Amino acid sequence: DRWAPLDALTLDAWLGRIAGEALLAGRINARQAPRLALSVFQERMLWARAIDADAAQDSDLFDREGLAVAVAAASDLAEVWSLPLPKDGGDGGNGGDVSEELRSFLRWRRHFHADCEHNGWLEPARLRAWQLRAIEAGACRLPARVSFAGFDRYTPQEHALMRALAARGVEVEELPLGRESAGAATLAGFPDRQAECRAAAAWAAGRL
């Protein structure tokens, strides 16, 4: 029998695959899907445009590209960790305690979201939220089991994904990496490279 490779993907790649399959199968209305999933570079360019468009700031005083990278990272964290933010650049009922930096961020974020909404774009963090809603709606075809591996901690967005998968009947598990104790090393000699390759293949097959 031919060995089947492990279907291991990053979270974003897997979500993109199952949502893309649902779109092609017609289980997701194309009109409800984003026209474009922004790449990291495209997202940063859009943030830079939002910063430039802010009449309250003199963008010539900033490292625009560096600021766009920092603002994109901050917005991503706010999305995936479900951080509460004041709306519309106000103080959120905090009596004016919001810093000028946060007010600027909120203005840029509002401009960024308006630009995305007008053009039908989504940056990675909100794209994941859209894909999660597609899973919850039953639009995506799911495997019987999904294993999470390599996460040192889970964001609220990832916990929501786990709950959505479990609600759809998927077995969700966490795959531990590494070993509880060090393995034992064994030294072996072989007459030539071909024999060594055959032995390595047999060793790997015995552990699959």
Where are these regions (language model features)?
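Short, solvent-exposed loop/turn segments at secondary-structure junctions
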Residues: 14, 152-154, 193
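Basic/charged alpha-beta structural segments of nucleotide/phosphate-handling enzymes
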Residues: 1-142, 156, 178
